[in-house]
Amino acid sequence: MKLNVNLPDHPYDVIIENGALANIGNWVSSLWKKQKIVLISDNHVNGLYGQKVVDQLEKSGFEVETFEFPEGEASKNLLTAEKAWNFCAEFGLTRSDGIIALGGGVTGDLAGFVASTYMRGIHFLQIPTSLTAQVDSSIGGKTGINSKMAKNMIGTFTQPDGVLIDPEVLKTLGQREFCEGLGEVIKCALIADKDLWNLLTDLSAKDLLENFAKIEEIIYRSCEVKRKVVVDDELDNGVRLYLNFGHTIGHAVENTAGYGKVMHGEAVAIGMVQISKIAEKKGLMPLGITDEIRKMVKKYGLPDDYQPWDEALLFKALTHDKKARGTIIKTVIVPEIGTAKINEVTFEEMKEYLKK
């Protein structure tokens, strides 16, 4: 399966294919001339796939070094980025060379940020190995690192030269890590694909883990939602905000819990349920939709709430949300399953939203 992210200034393909990792040398050769490559990966994923990828790239004529960092959201910071910049410089990476992200969302965000800022920008490719990264963060060009104030506070819009998705790598994920990615899949269904919602209604996490043909279909449909939105609004000024359904409260939960304690897809699931509950009470979403969303996230092993729910800490994190404009924050609601809408809320109203 192939999707084309047909942006006017930087079009690229997303390849979705079981077993694609075994053909990585040919794929990279079709996109880049023979050059130096820094492979960026965390210690866990690098241990699983790193040497195989390096061997194939070297066999195809590339000169490769690997920058490995400690697994987890806590590594997505300026210190790790600086270490990566220095690593690239010591290897002699120039603007004609490139960076490949091999890993989940943390790796993709970090590697993309490093590539977009090293020497004011060099080429990079995405090879996502988590479900969250495959269906969401590897596509669209958002890169970033966290600060203590907010998630992804420092970042750029920089499109990759290509994305290679191999669903078979998901077999190495634990159940929690796999289900976490379904938070973003459920979000895609809610904002833009009712047929995907119906498919998720008919399936279960167990079905998906046992049937990789279904996984491939779900990845494709989720990527297509992301592709359409990114092509319509590359820089996040309009409809791309729909992709943030559940993320306003979700990012605040991640921040207040401590990065990595609540996984991103889990936080998105919590955020979707909580913002829907508020919007339903205010008549902005239909009666009963929150229960439908809650039932779906729980069916796929995701949380619908977070404790301790500290309104003051959550509000402080929300004030640094990237969707804030002055004292107004743009939240996303779902008027009906398969559609989305922007709802502008003042900070004072958001304080009320956070009260339980």
Curated annotation (Swiss-Prot):
Q: Membrane-crossing residues?
A: none
Question: A GO CC term?
Answer: cytoplasm
From the UniProt record, give the pathway where this protein acts. Metabolic intermediate biosynthesis; chorismate biosynthesis; chorismate from D-erythrose 4-phosphate and phosphoenolpyruvate: step 2/7
Give the enzyme's main class according to its UniProt record, as a single word.
lyase
Record's catalysed reaction(s): 7-phospho-2-dehydro-3-deoxy-D-arabino-heptonate = 3-dehydroquinate + phosphate
The molecular function terms in GO held by this entry are: 3-dehydroquinate synthase activity; metal ion binding; nucleotide binding
Q: How is the cofactor bound?
A: Binds 1 divalent metal cation per subunit. Can use either Co(2+) or Zn(2+).
Cell compartment(s), UniProt = Cytoplasm
> What cofactor requirement does the entry state?
Co(2+); Zn(2+); NAD(+)
Which of this chain's residues are annotated to bind NAD(+)?
A: 71-76, 105-109, 129-130, 142, 151
Binding positions for Zn(2+) per the UniProt entry: E184, H247, H264
CDD domains according to UniProt: DHQS (cd08195)
Q: Which UniProt keywords apply?
A: Amino-acid biosynthesis, Aromatic amino acid biosynthesis, Cobalt, Cytoplasm, Lyase, Metal-binding, NAD, Nucleotide-binding, Zinc
The EC code for this enzyme is 4.2.3.4
What does this gene product do?
A: Catalyzes the conversion of 3-deoxy-D-arabino-heptulosonate 7-phosphate (DAHP) to dehydroquinate (DHQ).
Q: What is this protein called?
A: 3-dehydroquinate synthase
Which source organism?
Lactococcus lactis subsp. cremoris (strain MG1363)
Taxonomy, top ranks, is: Bacteria, Bacillati, Bacillota, Bacilli, Lactobacillales
